[in-house]
Structure formats: C-alpha cells, structure tokens
Swiss-Prot record:
GO cellular component terms, semicolon-separated: cytoplasm
Chief localization: cytoplasm
Gene name linked to the record: tsf
Role, per record: Associates with the EF-Tu.GDP complex and induces the exchange of GDP to GTP. It remains bound to the aminoacyl-tRNA.EF-Tu.GTP complex up to the GTP hydrolysis stage on the ribosome.
Alphabetized Gene3D superfamilies for the sequence: 1.10.286.20, DNA helicase RuvA subunit, C-terminal domain, Elongation factor Ts, dimerisation domain
CDD domains referenced in this protein's UniProt entry, alphabetically: UBA_EF-Ts
A Pfam family: EF_TS
The organism of origin for this protein: Photorhabdus laumondii subsp. laumondii (strain DSM 15139 / CIP 105565 / TT01) (Photorhabdus luminescens subsp. laumondii)
Keywords: Cytoplasm, Elongation factor, Protein biosynthesis
Region (Involved in Mg(2+) ion dislocation from EF-Tu): 82-85
Protein name: Elongation factor Ts
Disulfide bonds: none
GO molecular-function terms, A-Z: translation elongation factor activity
InterPro entries hit by this protein: EF-Ts_dimer_sf (IPR036402), Transl_elong_EFTs/EF1B (IPR001816), Transl_elong_EFTs/EF1B_dimer (IPR014039), Transl_elong_Ts_CS (IPR018101), UBA-like_sf (IPR009060)
Subcellular localization, as worded in the UniProt entry: Cytoplasm
Amino acid sequence: MSGITAALVKELRERTGAGMMECKKALVEANGDIELAIDNMRKSGQAKAAKKAGRVAAEGIILAEVAADGKFGALVELNCETDFVAKDAGFIAFGKEVMATVLADKISDIETLKAKFEEQRTALVAKIGENINIRRVSVLEGEQLGTYLHGARIGVLVAAEGANEELIKHVAMHIAASKPEYVNPSDVPADVVDREHQIQLDIAMQSGKPREIAEKMVSGRMNKFTGEISLTGQNFVMDPSKTVGDLLKENNATVTSFIRYEVGEGIEKVETDFAAEVAAMSK
C-alpha cells in the first residue's frame, strides 16, 4: 500500500460509502488518484455517487450579515478547536467585531482582514487557550440581498432581483439544506458535465446497449444531474412538488448569485484510530 495512506482510504470510504478493501484496491489501481478511483468505482457499480471532497472537522461559527444600506453583504467563518469555545461569549464578540469591520470597510480579501485583527486574535488565543483563526470571508453586492443562519454552523448569503424579503429567506433556507453548487443548470462548467457524461455513457454501454441508445439514455441522466446540483433545478424543500426555479418564476424573481458556508468544510482532522484499523486489516 505504498503511497496509499490510511487517510486517503478513509476519505474514499466517506465519499463513496464503499467498504475498506474495495477502496484500498481502487486507490492502488488508480495509483493514489482519488478522483480517478471514484470515477472507476462509479463505472464498475461499486459506488453510485460520490460526496464532494472536504470533511467537516474544525469547530467555530459562521457569521452572515447585510450592511444597513442593504446593498453589501458578507459571510465570515471564524474557527476554534472545540465546540465549547465556539459558544464562548468572548469568541462570539470577536466574530461580531470582525463582521462589523468587514461591512464598514467593505473588506473582501482574507489576508487584509487577518492583518487588521492579528493583535486582537493573538490576545484572544492567549486568554482562551485555543487556536483561533479568521478562516475566510466572502461578499456580495446587489440591490436585494438576504442571509440565513442555521444555528451558527451554516450560513447563506443570496443576491436576487424582483424578490421580497420572505422569498429570499426561503431560498436561502433551501440553499442551507440542499447545498446546490450553481444557480442554474446552464452554469455547470463544461468539464464537470463532460466528466459525468463519460461516466454515465460507460455505465450505459456496460449494460449492453448500442451506443446510439446509450447516448439517449445518458442525455436524460445529464439533465437530471445538472438539475440536482443547481439551485433552480432542485425541488424546493418547503414544497417538493415544484422546483426553486418554478418558485422564482411564480414571483417574477431571479437569484443572481449565492454563497454557502459550513463550519470546517474542507478542514481535515487526524483520526489515529482509523490508521490502527487499516493496519489490523493489512496483517
């Protein structure tokens, strides 16, 4: 298993739901390329789908707010090491001060923001006893902006046109729950579509269908694929009988962009017990 680490096997298991030995074998055959291993597992039927890379491990809070003029909004992620500190009054107050500065000075660059608060961050680390990090900031500008916070762990910022406050809130809640990656199916990048098309074509061809029929089957699957990962193509969580696109059309509204943050996404946490499990299985 040279070059195939326990962490890599674990990530493949989490993203595909497949067993350990299947994941180990797939990674060996793909020379450690996890994306290639996922594609091969999907083609062979070992994995029906794959979760997006990025395991949630870090603690902290998400802040979401729109400036008083309603035309500038921001999301900020502030990380700490434990859930206990994430609820600490001093930690939360620091986050609110960071957000207030982002809105007042319209800061969109994370390094600029970090530099502005480095002295206060260092002092807070010394006081609380945990590492604290202003991890990221994203902003949107527009005529109609809205936010939604699910607890303090998921935050959404939406820019829309022709929508009222309630509609924007409902759409933001949907985004928090359903995790769309794009606004419209047509926004899905060509390379993402091409990759999925090839996977679906290989699956269809393996069933013994002629290429012409396989292509027709794949066409329908691709419409479903782009719809499922785009906001307007998803079934609305509050009324699954319609899509979010239908909802917006009924209200003569459009969503121009959105940002979704979840605490710790993409930050890896070492788990030594899993390494022991792999070692035991390889004996």
